[in-house]
């Protein structure tokens, strides 16, 4: 859904470790947070509002997917629209759709590269926008590769496409978060990556949001103090290929969720679906991948969730999650397309979709017991 971006609403958010001493005294809007307690919400007098949020996993363009984008775009230049289009019916209906750009953008003439460099073409931003994404997290363990130039190129391309970037910046006083007004609701999107697994940009440690749990709570509190009614956190963290969150992941998200500062945590980083958990009313959903072309013998890395969470306003003005649903999406490297594991007729369900559902249902079982709805293939 398209929305009204709030160009100047919040002061820059950064973890204490990511900030450098300012050359002059800070203004009140830039002062350091001293309390991690969210401000009380005012009592709501008008009709109670709702917001549906779509969250999905990593977009990581390998050379084979780049080849499909070149073929799809033809003489008009590379296009990623067709590669992402399979998930559009899940993304477009949401009020606010969140994606994760795992790699930075190279210049248009530069190569799309494989591990360990991982750059992609800025045309990806257009594809992201056209399938319905409103904001993208950009903080990951690959953000630093092209330095400030690459961060600027990535964020500029997303903004030009109408997508709000979050998680990285080229100047220390710029915002690290995205702030948008959606259906009259002010939404802040914070993106961060695990500092233990994500190198800082040389000479610019403030460029990527590498905050700890305490730092992220402070950022969320600051966002609320500056007017955000809903705060969404995208967190890149986890062990690659693991089907379960690590102890560090669990500790981090538990502390953040219990703080009451955020409404939803969208996790990615392991490249596999790792389940979900509702902690003190806050859903934490580890999404897996959206679009990628990983190892052929690793089917779990070609699966992801597109989750839809309904946040409903309460009489006190706060928002709580009342519904959560996940749809399984398969990345098909050979065709360069996405397939949703959901059909009107069971005769249409493929063996691959049945396998993906069985594996995902096992991982999601605790979340299903908490009320999470996993869409069946038919």
Task: Show where each model-derived region lies.
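Sec-dependent signal peptide recognition
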Residues: 1-7
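Bacterial signal peptide processing site
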Residues: 14-17
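Acidic, metal/ion-coordinating pockets
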Residues: 22-378
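C-terminal motif of bacterial Sec signal peptides marking the signal peptidase cleavage site
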Residues: 10-12
